[in-house]
């Protein structure tokens, strides 16, 4: 290792939980926003500007965001990163490595 360079810090469980919470909020916000947008379009185009499609779309978005969050927290070993081809295994099937993103502090 070069002088002055520090070793990469080990990932703490608090940091991993924080990243999962951040990803959960971002995903839920995106899904709720998409549901509201689809609800607005459906309300204007098909339902004579009634408000229930907007509420229905936001509920569907919130429900899918909640479901994704539960799945993310229930499977602690899921790695979020890029899948990079690494050749083939002994049976001739493609093998992949998962490269996770390192957050700089």
UniProtKB/Swiss-Prot annotation:
Residues 47-105 are mitochondrial intermembrane. It is a single-pass membrane protein. The chain crosses the membrane at residues 29-46. It is found in: Mitochondrion inner membrane. InterPro entries: Mic10. Keywords: Membrane, Mitochondrion, Mitochondrion inner membrane, Transmembrane, Transmembrane helix. It comes from the Eukaryota. Residues 85-105 are annotated as: Disordered. GO terms for cellular component: MICOS complex; mitochondrion. Component of the mitochondrial contact site and cristae organizing system (MICOS) complex. PANTHER family: MICOS COMPLEX SUBUNIT MIC10. Belongs to the MICOS complex subunit Mic10 family. Component of the MICOS complex, a large protein complex of the mitochondrial inner membrane that plays crucial roles in the maintenance of crista junctions, inner membrane architecture, and formation of contact sites to the outer membrane. This is MICOS complex subunit Mic10.
């Amino acid at each position: 290792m070069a002088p002055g360079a520090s070793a990469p810090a080990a990932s703490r469980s608090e940091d991993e939980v924080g990243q999962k919470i951040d990803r959960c909020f971002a995903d839920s916000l995106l899904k709720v926003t998409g549901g509201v947008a689809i609800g607005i379009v459906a309300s204007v185009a098909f339902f004579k500007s009634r408000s229930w499609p907007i509420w229905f779309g936001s509920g569907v978005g919130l429900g899918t965001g909640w479901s994704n969050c539960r799945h993310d927290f229930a499977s602690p070993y899921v790695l979020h990163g890029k899948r990079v081809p690494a050749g083939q295994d002994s049976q001739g099937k493609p093998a992949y490595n998962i490269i996770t993103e390192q957050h700089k502090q």
